[in-house]
Amino acid sequence: MDKTYQPHAIETSWYQTWESENYFAPQGAGDSYTIMIPPPNVTGSLHMGHGFNNAIMDALIRFRRMQGRNTLWQPGTDHAGIATQMLVERRLEAQGVSRHELGREKFLDKIWEWKAESGGNISRQIRRLGSSVDWSRERFTMDDGLSDAVKEAFVRLHEDGLIYRGKRLVNWDTKLHTAISDLEVENHDEKGHLWNLRYPLADGAKTAEGLDYLIVATTRPETMLGDAAVAVNPQDERYKALIGKFVELPLVGRRIPIIADDYCDPEFGTGCVKITPAHDFNDYEVGKRHNLPLLNIFDKNANVLPAAQVFNLDGKLNESVDGTLPAAYAGLDRFEARKQIVAAFDAAGLLVSIDDHALKVPKGDRSGTIIEPWLTDQWYVSTKPLAEPAIAAVEDGRIAFVPKQYENMYFSWMRDIQDWCISRQLWWGHRIPAWYDESGKVYVGRDEAEVRAKNNLGPEIALQQDNDVLDTWFSSGLWTFSTLGWPEKTKALETFHSTDVLVTGFDIIFFWVARMIMLTLHLVKNEDGTPQVPFKTVYVHGLVRDGQGQKMSKSKGNVLDPLDIVDGIDLETLVEKRTSGLMQPQLAKKIEKQTRQEFADGIASYGTDALRFTFCSLASTGRDIKFDMGRVEGYRNFCNKIWNAARYVLDKGEDCGQNGEAVELSLADRWIISQLQRTEAEVTRQLDQFRFDLAAQALYEFIWNQYCDWYLELSKPVLWDETASIERQRGTRRTLVRVLEVALRLAHPFMPFITEEIWQRLAPLAGVEGKTIMLQPWPVANEARIDQAAEDDIEWLKGLMLAVRNIRGEMNIGPGKPLQLFLKNVSADDQRRLSENDYLLRKLAKLESMTVLTDGAEAPLSATALVGDMEVLVPMAGLIDKGAELARLDKEIQRLQGEVQRVGGKLSNAAFVDKAPPDVIAKERAKLTEAEQALGKLAEQHARIASL
């Protein structure tokens, strides 16, 4: 083995071996165990969330594979409708070509060309992270098979009365000209205004104060052209007498009613709210409750129409309401219209005031444009009939959420579910399988031939397919079963569905998880007709944030690419990566400064195993995962520790009883074997419960602290002892080898590369056969090998050695200097342990002599420590220069007093505490606590030495 651990020297070659040997394919004889990879967007590259997600899924798959389960981890990518279309459009625009010039078919050809060129990027990254997915089953949401499944699902849902076309309010992107989902809308906190406008009362009505007008407050004065009512709270005494009366809508002259609705907050503004059902989601709900007309005043660009389009709630034209609008505003952009309408109110004496107001402004996450609630014809899934069985599946335990608290989030969304808009005005995606004749009548079918045959439509009747495509979430909602061959009854579907676990972030429980559950329960049935669930467990993890708890985003400049941590990146390349392609280029300087401060030397290459172990160690039950580069460095050191331990074991491991020769186990051997059983049980228990953090912690504690720090040291005196029997030395060598071999198997799901590399060399010594560690059996604890007596004896031994080590440290005595040791208050058990471990203690604690003092015997002036009730004494005569040591301690105490004063002063400064970020204050408080504790210890040490 190389002297130092170099991850890049082993990782790629091992992955190629695993893949070429087909080790990732299903092959276990046990029950199936299936995970479907949440398909990343084909446009992108893996971010830290993907890296985290993959580490968790691979740990599960490798764990279950080693347990003998018939594992399938199936990879794939999502066609990502809007993201992909925008990306290819931008590429074409750079060449001076628009998609409209190309036409739909040629534009789609360009997208497929682009996918062929760059679609392999995600696959390359997944490989680099060591993910043991079955590449022979890689799928894409626009594959032919998946396209057939999508059409089938649409047609069946339509036949069951669960898909319909209707005119409703949607999030409209005025730049991309498509409806978008709530997940694609980002709410930005901005400073805006609240306009207070007078609306004259009609028919001579007066308020309780005798006024002939109401004052309404609005953040969007331009939408007043589409007002359908003014609402007040039914309990608001000021306006009770006006409910049912009318106001005259300024500038337009239309009479609109005053209605009572609990939506109005009497404390906000004047308590009167204008209701515009066609341009505000809350107003739309009020409109439904009061059967108000919907007046659409904007076109698809959010420019004012010459006349409002007036509809009833059922989407049919309302011809009884006059949609006339002032000609002055026709064709104006919504923000220009706002200026002119406010000016007209002012000129008419109807503008009361303009107040500053904090707003949440909805913007498209791709286009950056302000989203307009807009009334348009779209396709919808009727979700309430699908939600009820989906709620029941979680309530009755067929699907479990881990952690369980996320069930409440799921239930709250599902019990307040709205119909799902599934159409998008894009070209890239699954085209809706619906056709229209010249009269606008719609026909749904799997293809045009089926539509004609089913409806007896001859060739003389022209049919035009719907131009819209389906929401990406619709096809990904079928992901667990469409990728296994549904609607055909394939062997793969029969074997691997329902899947076992879905690993996902909490942010898409509604957008993806809930929809998968609803669609699967409705579309996939067992032989007896009972519905199948898509997965049995949903493991929900938090969002990966930076070390300060900030969300990682391009605009914050704190994004980390997992592969940059794996392979390393120099500072200049990192700066270039973080500052290029920004939506807000003005942030580039700030991001560059921040990056140069945080990563002055770039990012070192830590390797995949260190990153994966970091992710697993962070996988707690919280909603936030604070990613800390210090942890990666720590786990890279852990890899080094394992590597160095393996080099020692391989060096000492020959003649370890691999051919059945006799062995005798020492106390330390029995202890480490006992600890191994406990670790096997603990790691298995925590993985079964999805506590990857606790499993990683148990593994780290065993390998680093027990095996490397203690057992390797305890093994050395046995191997050096010329008086030890061959059987005793062979027993220690065998224990060194076999315990490490089992520990490697336990660590393999977390750290696949380093464990495989070492295992290949160690397996012959351990008497283990097999081509790869990944197909070795998972370790199972043997309770018969738990040796409580050995554990108690070694804990006592460790206590004594640590006591001596601490005295050396406190008294500044070199580790190689032999010590005399006196012991008082020695019990019979202590005496036995001293006798049995005399040689071990003398060697490891560097003891010149050990003397047990009888009761009443005087001890020389000594530094002391306790091990249980036994007193440990180290005479100081000749070991330290008392004066020099006190002077050294005085100097250090003085330095720490200065530090306490400096940090304490900073924290008592109100100006600092008020202005500094919380994480900076927390760091300063931690610094103060640390300095105070160190000062206390040094003062104790000073007193002890002064008393000698």
Curated annotation (Swiss-Prot):
Domain of life where this protein originates: Bacteria
EC number: 6.1.1.9
Major subcellular location class: cytoplasm
Keywords attached to this entry: Aminoacyl-tRNA synthetase, ATP-binding, Coiled coil, Cytoplasm, Ligase, Nucleotide-binding, Protein biosynthesis
Binding, ATP: 554
One Gene Ontology cellular component: cytosol
Compartment annotation: Cytoplasm
MF-aspect GO terms: aminoacyl-tRNA deacylase activity; ATP binding; valine-tRNA ligase activity
Enzyme class: ligase
Catalytic activity, reaction form: tRNA(Val) + L-valine + ATP = L-valyl-tRNA(Val) + AMP + diphosphate
Subunit (UniProt): Monomer.
Function: Catalyzes the attachment of valine to tRNA(Val). As ValRS can inadvertently accommodate and process structurally similar amino acids such as threonine, to avoid such errors, it has a 'posttransfer' editing activity that hydrolyzes mischarged Thr-tRNA(Val) in a tRNA-dependent manner.
PANTHER family for the chain: VALINE--TRNA LIGASE, CHLOROPLASTIC_MITOCHONDRIAL 2, VALYL-TRNA SYNTHETASES
UniProt remark on domains: ValRS has two distinct active sites: one for aminoacylation and one for editing. The misactivated threonine is translocated from the active site to the editing site. The C-terminal coiled-coil domain is crucial for aminoacylation activity.
Designated name of the protein: Valine--tRNA ligase
Species of provenance: Pseudomonas syringae pv. tomato (strain ATCC BAA-871 / DC3000)
